[in-house]
């Protein structure tokens, strides 16, 4: 098996089915690609019926307790057979063949540990494929959209988002996979950091020549629960990696208050444009 795709689903089976149908349509590895769906949904909202509607030949469905995004991905990784594991969100939609090229990139470069591709919004405008690592600078927050638009990825201070994270399986398993103490957010930068620490020559690549749609687009969900998850992960990750998490908390709090102030002064249409 060349590539194993692991998809952690949480409710919303229709979106998952669109994802699976696009994978089937643009599968250029045929039976050398497998798909593993890990279902973190509540028992009464499982997505198994949608998975059964897919015509993908090599597909596994695994119901799981919701212990977090990283933990769900680990469930899939443990049963995967591929040399490369692709962790993708259920709200991605393929618009072209990508797997043969990604696999070729890993085969050609034995130091390649992680690869991501360009994420587009539903209207095909540039989305967010990568972010700055543990950022505490306002200018980076304001310019990250431009960096993504131009495809300017710097592996020294950026990380590929977990919406499309392709990793070399042996390296991933040798650093004990995702940290399951992180429920959501920062798990991709954490595993990238551990891989680079264990493998000094490991490389992270952003392939801007390949693309897929990410329906979520910009991070517009500001619910209190998700904000708390993000902050809990941010503090845990900072402590774990001996970063100045107190400075990070002050920065994020100040930036959050600033955005709330700006949002109170602009129209709803401008708010949508701003968050995208």
Task: Write out the residue ranges for each language-model feature.
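Acidic donor-binding segment of Leloir-type glycosyltransferases
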Residues: 20-63
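Short, flexible, basic/aromatic active-site loop/helix in glycosyltransferases
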Residues: 134-157
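Short aromatic/hydrophobic "clamp" motif used to bind/position activated sugar donors
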Residues: 85
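Non-catalytic, C-terminal membrane-associated alpha-helical segments of glycosyltransferases
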Residues: 223-276
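Glycine-rich, basic loop-to-helix element that forms the pyrophosphate-binding segment
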Residues: 64-80
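Active-site donor/metal-binding and catalytic loop motifs
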Residues: 192, 200-224, 234-237
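A short, conserved alpha-helix in the catalytic core of glycosyltransferases
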Residues: 158-177, 181-210
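Conserved donor NDP-sugar-binding/catalytic core segment of glycosyltransferases
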Residues: 97-129
């Amino acid at each position: 098996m060349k590539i194993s795709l692991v998809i952690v689903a949480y409710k919303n089976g229709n979106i998952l089915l669109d994802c699976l149908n696009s994978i089937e349509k643009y599968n250029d590895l045929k039976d050398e690609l497998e798909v593993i769906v890990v279902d973190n949904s509540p028992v009464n909202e499982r997505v198994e019926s949608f998975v059964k509607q897919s015509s993908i030949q090599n597909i596994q469905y695994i119901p799981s307790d919701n212990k977090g995004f990283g933990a769900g991905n680990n469930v899939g990784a443990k049963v995967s057979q591929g040399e490369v594991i692709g962790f993708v969100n259920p709200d991605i939609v393929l618009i072209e063949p990508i797997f043969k090229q990604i696999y070729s990139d890993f085969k050609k470069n034995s130091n390649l540990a992680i690869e991501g591709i360009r994420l587009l919004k539903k209207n095909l405008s540039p989305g967010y494929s990568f972010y700055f690592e543990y950022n505490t600078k306002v200018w980076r927050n304001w310019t990250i959209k431009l960096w993504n638009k131009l495809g300017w990825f710097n592996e020294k201070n950026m990380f590929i988002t977990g919406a499309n994270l392709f990793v070399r399986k042996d390296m991933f398993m040798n650093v004990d996979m995702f940290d399951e103490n992180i429920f959501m957010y920062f798990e991709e930068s954490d595993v990238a950091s551990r891989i680079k620490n264990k493998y000094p020559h490991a490389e992270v690549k952003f392939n801007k020549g390949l693309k897929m749609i990410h329906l979520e687009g910009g991070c517009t969900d500001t619910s209190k629960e998700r904000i708390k998850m993000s902050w809990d992960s941010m503090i845990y990750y900072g402590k774990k990696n001996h970063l100045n998490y107190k400075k990070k908390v002050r920065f994020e709090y100040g930036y959050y208050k600033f955005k709330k102030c700006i949002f109170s002064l602009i129209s709803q249409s401008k708010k949508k444009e701003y968050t995208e």
